[in-house]
Amino acid sequence: MEAQQDFTKHPEVAQDRLVLYVRKAIPAPTANSLKPLMILEALEIPYSIHLISSLSQETWYHEINPYKQLPALEDIDLVETSGGSKRRLNVFDSSAMLIYLCDKHDKDGLFIGRNATERAQVTSWLIAYAAGLGATGEWWLKMRHDENLKPALRVIENAIRREYDILEKRLGEPGQRWIALADRPTVADFAIQPLANPRVARNAAIDFEAWPRTKAWSEAVDRLAYIDRAKRLNNKLGMTEEEIELHGR
């Protein structure tokens, strides 16, 4: 008889590289899992992926993210606990992961800012996104679109429109090709674009053409080779070849 898995014990994972904890990309891939994948691919950081099948059953994971949400990561660096023992560093919240990975690996500040002025711009847009478009866009994708929810969905739709208006105004400033910095993409672009694109707009019954600068920017982000790699991976996380074919991924 096959031994049952002990969901209270941390499973064996790679010890020589960062481990990213995510869920399977069915029924749909998530924007939050995509964000750390973007910076991992952009900075070519070695990593492995571990799939979480049940957030409620796999109680060992609650030590990695006390909010019991995905994604999260464990790095190879050790931290000391209050009891004096050592454990791997855990980072949760996708925006926190973007900042952490840049602090550790982006030595030139390409994606997080080369000085305090640039960093302030990047983190301002990143954190504002988490409170604005990140929250409203995620709720739109999660809620069932039935008649009883129409008033709530209308509120979320209007909030998404306001967020797109802000992006459109920002991109209308002279020389502003990207969201935070004018000359190059940053983690602010990585965080925002998964919820500012034609697919999300279409799901919210919003015509993305109404924000032409935002649409052009979103397409420019998609053309970045490392973003394309991250999205392809995110779309197929944990899926078999049969599932990939069935879902057209």
From Swiss-Prot:
Annotated protein name in UniProt: Glutathione S-transferase tcpG
Pathway: Secondary metabolite biosynthesis
Family: Belongs to the GST superfamily.
Domain GST N-terminal: residue ranges: 20-109
Induction: Expression is increases towards the late stages of rye plants infection. Expression is positively regulated by the thioclapurine cluster-specific transcription factor tcpZ.
GO MF annotations, alphabetized: glutathione transferase activity
Domain GST C-terminal stretches: 115-249
Enzyme kind, highest EC tier: transferase
InterPro entries noted in UniProt: Glutathione-S-Trfase_C-like, Glutathione-S-Trfase_C_sf, Glutathione_S-Trfase, Glutathione_S-Trfase_N, GST_C, Thioredoxin-like_sf
Superkingdom field: Eukaryota
Enzyme Commission designation: 2.5.1.18
Keywords: Transferase
Originating species: Claviceps purpurea (strain 20.1) (Ergot fungus)
Biological function: Glutathione S-transferase; part of the gene cluster that mediates the biosynthesis of an unusual class of epipolythiodioxopiperazines (ETPs) lacking the reactive thiol group important for toxicity. Firstly, L-tyrosine is prenylated by tcpD, before undergoing condensation with L-glycine in a reaction catalyzed by the NRPS tcpP leading to the diketopiperazine (DKP) backbone. Afterwards the alpha-carbon of tyrosine is oxidized by the cytochrome P450 tcpC to form a hydroxyl group.
Catalytic activity: RX + glutathione = an S-substituted glutathione + a halide anion + H(+)
Encoding gene (name): tcpG
